[in-house]
Amino acid sequence: MTMPTNQCPWRMQVHHITQETPDVWTISLICHDYYPYRAGQYALVSVRNSAETLRAYTISSTPGVSEYITLTVRRIDDGVGSQWLTRDVKRGDYLWLSDAMGEFTCDDKAEDKFLLLAAGCGVTPIMSMRRWLAKNRPQADVRVIYNVRTPQDVIFADEWRNYPVTLVAENNVTEGFIAGRLTRELLAGVPDLASRTVMTCGPAPYMDWVEQEVKALGVTRFFKEKFFTPVAEAATSGLKFTKLQPAREFYAPVGTTLLEALESNNVPVVAACRAGVCGCCKTKVVSGEYTVSSTMTLTDAEIAEGYVLACSCHPQGDLVLA
């Protein structure tokens, strides 16, 4: 089997697939070579073993603890990658993965007091790190608060019995769950909150709220992982974008990233991590004003030529694209 793209050089075989919740599955993979990764990182997956379609998924397993490399995936109605992984991929199939990526990890944090906050599928890197801390920092004081819609939506439900965890459910609450959502009162009740390293993963509004609240409560060590946002509808006014090849003009609202502008107008672009790390969305800007929040993977020569990472490019005016 030929490697579909140099970005995904790791071939892994599906050993088994486990359904976690009504819409989430864990795919357990065998890698016949040593695959280096850190708890909390993610990898790109070549969807249908193609070079054009790559998607980023958290590696939900834990190095030095888990028997398999695992990806835990929520099926999304229009998700190209998630539909393929949860409907079509079967035991014995092969997947191609990239090197592990991302800095959302706990192994470089020197402190031994953690508060891990997760919502929905954002629990995947949290569980990876929770296992790692139990194995490598058994002395660490680790608190976990996990928010779900219903008790049936708890991912890794059996495994959470091994660790102290506060479960919060919005609906259909049963014994062992707190009803509602995460509140400031719940956060304030965490012992020694201000001295903890707080790490969170989940939908963007959830993480933004968490950041605001924990910082107001005195937390200084705060880290969050980005989850992806849906593609917006195409705009008819705002910033103007002129693409030279093929020739076309389109618009996007002020404040959007270049990637959001491209995707909302159905301009072909490969995007995987959406966090300025993987380099998939490299795009050349011919003219126009913009700022960038990441240039990882770009060489000095590429930057000088006008290349940007579309996910990390913030147009300040009209742009002309190659």
UniProtKB/Swiss-Prot annotation:
One of its GO terms (molecular function) is oxidoreductase activity, acting on NAD(P)H. The keyword Cell division does not apply. Keywords: 2Fe-2S, Electron transport, FAD, Flavoprotein, Iron, Iron-sulfur, Metal-binding, NAD, Oxidoreductase, Transport. [2Fe-2S] cluster binds at residues 273, 278, 281, 311. InterPro entries: 2Fe-2S_ferredoxin-like_sf, 2Fe-2S_ferredoxin-type, Beta-grasp_dom_sf, Cbr1-like_FAD-bd_dom, FAD-bd_FR_type, FNR_nucleotide-bd, MRET, OxRdtase_FAD/NAD-bd. Binds 1 [2Fe-2S] cluster. Residues 111-213 are annotated as: Oxidoreductase. Residues 237-322 form the 2Fe-2S ferredoxin-type domain. Its cofactor is [2Fe-2S] cluster; FAD. It is an enzyme of class 1 (oxidoreductase). It holds the Pfam family NAD_binding_1. SUPFAM superfamilies: 2Fe-2S ferredoxin-like, Ferredoxin reductase-like, C-terminal NADP-linked domain, Riboflavin synthase domain-like. In the N-terminal section; belongs to the FAD-binding oxidoreductase type 6 family. NADH oxidoreductase acting in concert with HCP. This is NADH oxidoreductase HCR. The gene is hcr.
